[in-house]
Every structure is written in C-alpha cells, then in structure tokens.
Amino acid sequence: MKITILSGGTGTPKLIQGFKEILPNEDISVIVNTGEDTYIGDIYLSPDIDTVLYTFSDLINDETWYGLKGDTFICHEQLKKFGSDEVLKIGDKDRALKMHKASSLKKGVLMSEIVDIERNSLSIKSKIYPMSNEKVESKVLIEENNEKILLKFHDFWIFRKGNAKVLDIFYENSNYAKAADGVLKAIEESDFVLIGPSNPITSIGPILSISEIKNALKEKLVFAVSPIVGENPVSGPAGTLMNAKGYPVNAIGVYEYYKDIVDVLVLDNSDINKKKDINCEVLYANTIMKTIDDKINLARNILDYYKSR
C-alpha cells in the first residue's frame, strides 16, 4: 500500500511518526508546505520541510517541534552578542541544514533536488517533496492602528506571535506556480492521499493553492484529519486564520474548507455531534496525539478504515 501525505506545521509530523512505525517507509510520500519559507540573513528557513526531514530521521525535537533534539546554540548566542535580531532560536546543526539550502539555491539548484540530497544524507527511505520549486509565499493581512499591513507568515507568527487582527491570508504567486518534480506522480501512484491535522489555512492551503495539485487530488481518494477538536485548534493560529477566511472554528469549518476534495473526514470522538452537517464519510477516532501509541493508533485506524471500504 502506498500513501501520500500533505504536511505542514507540527500536527501532521506527529501522525507521520505513527505511519512510519506501521508501513514500509518506502511506501510513504510526503508533499510539504513551503509557503512559510524565507531567508534569514545568510540561511534559508524552510520550517515544514526540515520538520519532516527530522521526523523521519528520528532527530526531531518533539518538545518544540522544530530543530533537532540535543542541538547546541553556540552560533545563535554569539550572534545575539553581536546585536543580531534573530528571534527564532536556531541550533548549530539545524543551522547547517539551512545554510546548505541557502548556498544550493544561490547556485541554482532546485528545491526538490536540495530536499532529495538532504533526505538521502539522513538515510530516509520515504519520499519528501516540496509543494513547488517556485516561490509561493503565505502573506497575512493585518490591521494595526487603523492601518493595513501585509506580513510574511514568519513575521506574523515568530515576531508578533500571532498577536494581530487578521483580515485575510494570501498565497503570493500561487496562480503561476507548478507542482514540484515528483509531486503529481506521487499522488497518482498512491492508494489514497491523507491531509494531516495541520492548520488548513497556512499549512495545507498553500499546497492546495497550486491548481495542478488540487486538480490531481480531485481524482483520488482523500482522507483529511481535522486539527480542531470541539471549538479549539489543537495548536497554533488555525482558529484566528479560519475566522479571517470566514470559516467556523470547528469540524464543520474544516469540512467546508476541504469539501471540494475530501472523501473521508477524520474527527475526534468528541465531535460525533457534528456528523449531520458534513456531507462526506466520517471516521471517528482519538485525534489527540500525546504518546507514540496515540500516533500509531490513529494511523492504524485510518489504514483499517481504508481497507474496509
């Protein structure tokens, strides 16, 4: 069985930890959001790609869900002494990966090629694809002191910690972007596609904003795991961003966002009362993943449901 997972943020990597324990890793492909990618000084930050790389290689710091466990921060601390405004605390080994991306991009190497080099260097058997080799950037329109300001997602979430009145979210350049090499083939060859429990607006939305990818998904069996339980996002700014796009912050809002492509919506057991407003198949499970057993059980529930259809 082959599956393709759409991933961004920190929710989906937790579920990936479950799938990689019960499926041959070479049968898992992941298409990753790059809408938050940005240069910081001389390094290239691709947070969602790096998190997936570290998840598959068992290096992820699963307390912060970015960077490597056990990393040191000598470079970051030295930069701060020099007056650097580096807000995100980047570890030394993690910085090396980001330096590799920056230097490779400046040489004209495609992002899909860079990620594949890094994947192989970390002995990862699963395929990992950036959503596009072209720059698609998530932008957040906020209002501050009666003035509208357009921010990169990194500035909105890292510098401002999401504390702003959000008016809208855009995916800059998505109208012109193409799927990265290997993405469409991975979708076509998979038995089903899984949209992980990530923020629909800025973790999955940029991937779906590329028309080639969304059109390919319309031809496949698609599962989507809700990142919202009850009226609350499990983590991150999903609630604020869904409100800004006009979606209710609950399972119904998640369904409305994905309704053009989703066949099976995976909801937490506590959301059983939402079924009547959702016009697709619904799988109920424990979607709160606190332990590795939780992650494996959710992955297994999804696979078992697929096999029973």
From Swiss-Prot:
Entry keyword Magnesium: yes
Keywords: Magnesium, Transferase
Requisite cofactors: Mg(2+)
Known role: Catalyzes the transfer of the 2-phospholactate moiety from (2S)-lactyl-2-diphospho-5'-guanosine to 7,8-didemethyl-8-hydroxy-5-deazariboflavin (FO) with the formation of oxidized coenzyme F420-0 and GMP.
Residue sites binding 7,8-didemethyl-8-hydroxy-5-deazariboflavin per the record: 50, 89
Pathway in which the depicted protein is active: Cofactor biosynthesis; coenzyme F420 biosynthesis
Coiled-coil residue spans: none
GO biological process: F420-0 metabolic process
Species for this entry: Methanococcus maripaludis (strain C6 / ATCC BAA-1332)
Organismal lineage: Archaea, Methanobacteriati, Methanobacteriota, Methanomada group, Methanococci
Protein name from the UniProt record: 2-phospho-L-lactate transferase
